[in-house]
């Protein structure tokens, strides 16, 4: 079973959840605001995703903008970025879909289909 991590009020997350339900994909739901990802989880997900760490940031979020992360991220180390992401789930791009051997960040139907539809 995959883990589906999102913010329920996010419209992209709502579309992703509907897609999972419509395709009868079993998932474990987790509200990213109520249950913030831990530093260890973020390290594991980053490694498993193969993506640059900057892709894990919710660049359209108010918190990202208020912290001026657009200008700060280029000078931060991966450790500093991971620690920052672990402080608030609203900094993390969502939804996240996590399987045994993959992590998908954001909702792209084609990518999700390739990973979970048999």
Regions picked out by a protein language model, each given a short descriptive name:
Residues 1-23, 27-32:
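Local sequence-structure signature of Cys/Sec-based thiol-disulfide redox active-site neighborhoods
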Residues 34-118:
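Thiol/selenol-based redox catalytic cores and closely related redox-interacting motifs
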């Amino acid at each position: 079973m995959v883990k589906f991590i999102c913010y329920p009020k996010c419209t992209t997350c709502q579309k992703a959840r509907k897609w999972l339900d419509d395709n009868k994909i079993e998932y474990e739901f987790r509200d990213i605001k109520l249950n913030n990802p831990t530093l260890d989880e973020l390290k594991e997900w980053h490694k498993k995703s193969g993506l640059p760490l900057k892709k894990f940031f919710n660049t359209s979020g108010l918190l990202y903008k208020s912290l001026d992360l657009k200008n700060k991220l280029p000078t931060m180390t991966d450790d500093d970025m991971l620690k920052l992401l672990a402080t608030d789930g609203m900094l993390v791009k969502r939804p996240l879909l996590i399987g045994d051997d993959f992590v998908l960040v954001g909702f792209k139907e084609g990518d999700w289909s390739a990973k979970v539809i048999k």
